[in-house]
Regions:
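Core segments of cupin and vicinal oxygen chelate
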Residues: 2, 9-44
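Generic alpha-helical propensity signal that fires on short helical segments
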Residues: 21-28, 45-47, 61-64, 75-79, ...
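Vicinal oxygen chelate
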Residues: 5-13, 32, 49-110
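Conserved short beta-strand elements that form part of the metal-binding/catalytic scaffold
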Residues: 28-55, 61, 103-108
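Residue-level marker for the onset of beta-strands and adjacent loop->beta junctions
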Residues: 6, 25, 33-35, 55, ...
């Protein structure tokens, strides 16, 4: 089973200011809305009203079968896994937390 870092999501208080900051550094904004923005370089900005996820890091996986395998392994180990969710960008993911409480997302392109 292989994983690839997909993105890191951070919370911001002022979306416009944060987007302008990253764009001034040469980051390429792929998606921008009032509650979250995403840059090609793998930075996701979560606005104050975004409540789908906490700050997290996301691992890109191959497909639904791999997602089911990971979810089963985690639940067998006693970890809670959210139900898979289809995002507006077409990806499907689920969230879980590591033993230290850090949120982790696993996602694939549907």
């Amino acid at each position: 089973m292989s994983y690839q870092l997909d993105h890191i999501a951070i919370r911001v208080k002022d979306m416009d200011r944060a987007v302008a900051y990253y764009m001034s550094l040469g980051f390429n904004c792929e998606w921008e809305s009032d509650d979250w923005s995403y840059f090609e370089e793998g930075i996701a900005l979560l606005g104050p009203k975004y409540n789908r996820a906490d700050p997290h890091f996301a691992m890109h996986i191959e497909n639904e079968d791999q997602m089911n395998e990971i979810r089963k392994k985690l639940t067998d180990m006693g970890h809670h896994c959210d139900k898979p969710y289809k995002h507006r960008d077409g990806t499907v993911s689920f969230y879980t937390r590591d033993p230290e409480g850090n949120q982790l997302e696993f996602l694939y392109d549907s």
